[in-house]
């Protein structure tokens, strides 16, 4: 069963700022290019609209069973504190507290994961 989307309002994001955030906060563990390698975390290419835990990566049961279909709203809340949003996730990232940083990163992820 799909997890309902959170009821949040997301500011407009800037993908160029999001690219910088991805490089500094995410690229140590993730790639986002088509055919990119799996690092400590999964390649994020094409993850928008996909069920959490659905790609070629050894996801935790928590991710596989979360019922999340990745969208802007799910990401916006998830990125505040991944371990709180999906208890039991392998994601070790502490999160992004600033709304604008999350909006910028989401704009970049959405753009880069579909190129």
From Swiss-Prot:
Heme c binds at residues 26, 29-30, 91. Keywords: Electron transport, Heme, Iron, Metal-binding, Mitochondrion, Respiratory chain, Transport. It is found in: Mitochondrion intermembrane space. InterPro entries: Cyt_c-like_dom (IPR009056), Cyt_c-like_dom_sf (IPR036909), Cyt_c_1A/1B (IPR002327). The keyword Transmembrane helix does not apply. GO terms for molecular function: electron transfer activity; heme binding; metal ion binding. SUPFAM superfamilies: Cytochrome c. The keyword Mitochondrion applies. One of its GO terms (cellular component) is mitochondrial intermembrane space. Its main location: mitochondrion. Binds 1 heme c group covalently per subunit. Gene3D superfamilies: Cytochrome c-like domain. Belongs to the cytochrome c family. Electron carrier protein. The oxidized form of the cytochrome c heme group can accept an electron from the heme group of the cytochrome c1 subunit of cytochrome reductase. Cytochrome c then transfers this electron to the cytochrome oxidase complex, the final protein carrier in the mitochondrial electron-transport chain. This is Cytochrome c. The lineage of its organism: Eukaryota, Sar, Alveolata, Apicomplexa, Aconoidasida.
